[in-house]
Design a protein with these regions (language model features):
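Catalytic cores of nucleotide-sugar-dependent glycosyltransferases that transfer UDP/GDP/TDP-activated
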Residues: 2-486
Length: 486
């Protein structure tokens, strides 16, 4: 009997669920490997072992090996641990002087660069000792940007590494890992000629993400539209020229969400479970419960709009602030959950004080409350300035909560705007970053909700029928792996 050759993939990243999480990157690194076809791919993950990991997670780790490596002009300890989680093999790089502390990321950018340069070199150095020779290393964001560089530079001579390919995924182009050339050259030990404008140098600094983009065999980002946007100066964060040059190797693949965790039929956080068949009767019971819990006027018929977000400019809070007073004159309720810039936190608190029966400000973060908001609200507002992928709108669609979004990045790719003439669409959208354009779109949604309820429910039907599970995304990543490995 013939046997299929297992393609070996290694994920390298700075965080991953369930071990450590600060943002959406961890969800991707923790979820995607679970859904890659185990018959054809052997997928493993490398992340740092942070001292601030929860104790129950640390208890799962087993010692594998340790060694010493030349790094930053000294001989440095590298410990390697491992764990199995949801059928995926995880490895951890252990060095308390780099990964100690109360949080994964520190506030000193120079030290962060040293820390992740160490991580990149340690991952590559550890592989021969683990008896795992990946065909492809899948890197994520600037923290692993040096892996493609090191692969082509100091590790390229060894037989073990010679045919290894690399791909880098850009989750947010804003963060690039920049510091002065002299320091970064000293830390990384790379030759001087690597710090030219066609390699790691950008605008007189060394740039680790740029290094990854230049040296990786392919580049991906987290939605088709964002892949196009980052080739333009407005979204390109200074790297648009390079991304245009690499456009043949650049592709967008939308992130998924975990349909096990986000499922209105089985969600333990919500008062009343519901599904695509019975939402017309059952979903409103969650609204009633949330109105009582948050002290809003209890009214089944009142349109409730939700927002679960960091309260920052990137998320469009300046647009909301500009028209908030006008919006509060409408026959709606507005529920906000999240923290962020002080002026926006205070703005939301002010309107909660002024319109207590209409606005509920929850200036903290709670996973349980976020689920309740997704289940209770009729619409979900997401007017981002830029949004590489966005997960909130995918969760909203899953819960039959109609997204109102700005057409940018992943929002444009995942929310189909309502067309009343063709009776299509899964949400509402506006094009320009303009507060009154947003307000007009919200008011159009209000009109459909109040005056054409059957049409509204059909939008909900279509929203709940979309499939943005990880299974779909994993299929697209597998195609790319096949293309790269051959």
């Amino acid at each position: 009997m013939w046997r299929v050759y297992m393609k070996k993939i290694l994920f390298a990243a700075s965080e991953g669920v369930p071990f450590i999480k600060t943002g959406g990157l961890a969800d991707v690194v923790g979820s995607l490997p679970k859904y890659i076809d185990k018959e054809y791919f052997d997928v493993r993950v490398f992340i740092p072992k942070y001292t601030c990991m929860k104790q129950e997670m640390k208890d799962k780790l087993r010692y594998v090996t340790h060694f010493y490596m030349d790094f930053n002009w000294q001989n440095v300890y590298v410990g390697v641990l491992e764990a199995e989680e949801a059928g995926v093999h995880y490895y951890f790089i252990d060095n308390e002087s780099y990964f100690g502390g109360f949080k994964p990321y520190g506030d000193d950018p120079r030290y962060e660069i040293e820390k992740y340069a160490y991580f990149c070199k340690a991952v590559l150095s550890a592989l021969p000792l683990l008896n795992f020779q990946p065909d492809l290393i899948h890197c994520h964001d600037w923290q692993t940007g040096l892996i493609p560089v090191y692969l082509k530079e100091r590790f390229h001579g060894g037989d073990f590494y010679r045919n290894m390919k690399s791909v880098i995924t850009i989750h947010n182009l804003k963060f690039q890992g920049k510091w002065d050339v002299k320091t970064v050259q000293s830390i990384t030990g790379l030759p001087e000629y690597y710090f030219t404008s066609d390699k790691l140098e950008a605008y007189k600094d060394a740039n680790l993400l740029k290094g990854g983009i230049v040296f990786a065999d392919a580049v991906t980002t987290v939605s088709d539209t964002y892949a196009e946007e980052i080739k333009t100066p407005f979204y390109g964060e200074g790297l648009d020229g390079l991304l245009r040059a690499r456009s043949h190797d650049l592709r967008g693949i939308v992130n998924g969400i975990d349909y096990g965790e986000f499922n209105p039929e089985t969600d333990k956080n919500i008062v009343k479970a519901y599904n695509a068949v019975n939402f017309r009767k059952e979903k409103v019971k969650n609204k009633r419960a949330l109105q009582e819990e948050l002290g809003l006027r209890v009214d089944d018929k009142k349109m409730m709009i939700g927002l679960v977000s960091r309260l920052t400019d990137q998320k469009g809070l300046d647009l909301i602030a500009y028209v908030m007073d006008e919006l509060c004159q409408d026959d709606i309720q507005f529920v906000v959950l999240g923290t962020g810039e002080e002026r926006y936190e205070n703005m939301v608190r002010h309107f909660d004080w002024k319109y207590g029966d209409k606005v509920a400000a929850n200036i903290y973060y709670s996973d349980a409350l976020s689920h309740k908001i997704y289940a209770a609200c009729d619409a979900y507002l997401m007017p981002s300035l830029f949004e590489p992928c966005g997960l909130s709108q995918l969760i909203a669609l899953r819960y039959g909560t109609v997204p109102i979004v700005r057409e940018t990045g992943g929002l444009k790719d995942t929310v189909q705007p309502y067309n009343e003439y063709e009776s299509t669409g899964t949400g509402f959208s506006f094009t320009n970053y303009n507060a009154h354009e947003m307000l007009n779109t919200i008011r159009y949604a209000e009109h459909i909700y109040y005056d054409r309820k059957r049409e509204w429910n059909k939008i909900v039907d279509r929203a709940m029928a979309t499939d943005y599970s990880w299974k779909v995304s994993a299929g697209k990543y597998q195609e790319m792996y096949d293309w790269l490995i051959g």
